[in-house]
Amino acid sequence: MVVTGSPPIPGTAAVTSAGLSAPRQSGRSFASAENAFSPITRFLAFALLSCVGLQALGLDFADETVTQTLCAALLLLGLPHGTFDWQLLHAGLQRSIYTFALRLGLYLGLAAATYLAWQIAPIAALTIFLLIAIFHFAEDWESDVILANSSATKPKFLALAMPISIITLPALSHQEMLRSIFVMLSGDESAVMLVDVMILLAPVATGVATAKIFMDCATGEISRGIAGICVLSAMVILPPIAGFSLYFCLYHSPLHFSTGWKQLTVDQAKYSALIVAGLTIGGLAIAALVYSFGQGSTVTGNLVATAFVTLSLLTVPHMIMPSLVSRRHSSL
């Protein structure tokens, strides 16, 4: 049987009376129509249908003006969800000023190293960014449901298949456009080889991702399943940047932002809005610097590079820092 009550936002676990996360038991019944979809999934589906309608009416989502707008949206709507990294820094400050300085230095060092990698070996930096993004996005699709007649949850590789499919599907549906984007990001024609690899991975990853979507729906996680359908559809129907923007801005970021906000204490929540706003402005300042040093031959090229390079500067420390801090014998 599926645990009754309002389901948690996808990617979060049910909470027991002891305040600890606990897996949810799956079954054959489905959630009610009223509770089947989270607000995030509903808005995602509405946005996808709207985009499909606008595209049918003649709007070109690959147009330069639209692309520039989408890149701005990636920064404005995408940056806030990563600003909860300040909690790690704040926790370090509570331990000692030395720990705080060490964490801050490591965070900035990782970001600086990432930027340096883009300058020295852009294709390698792009490849690493895509790999890190896959593991990061997999968090959106991890399940906490215990399979019926079993003590196990769904295999982790199913969650990993979703972001691999999301990232590689445009290689099948918009191959030449994706090639030009990768060349634009790296400044190297050899970057098209990444698209060739994606063409090989996409069918397998999408097949596994489709199986996961069916499994999610069959085990009562309809909201996550519908979100998966919407995101994969967007990556096929819309141009690469438009499809990715839809996923990143309307599903990934809200999901992580809401999860991070719920983890705050009452006292933290009082000043978190100001801190998040301040850090977002700081992120935009970094984006402005990246843009000012851009080597793109066009405004659109520079904006695309700025959006994705800036996201990589924040994603790398965002992914690496927690694991470093959580090490049992770490001085952090």
What do these predicted ranges mean?
Residues 48-54, 106-115, 225-234:
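Hydrophobic, membrane-inserted alpha-helices
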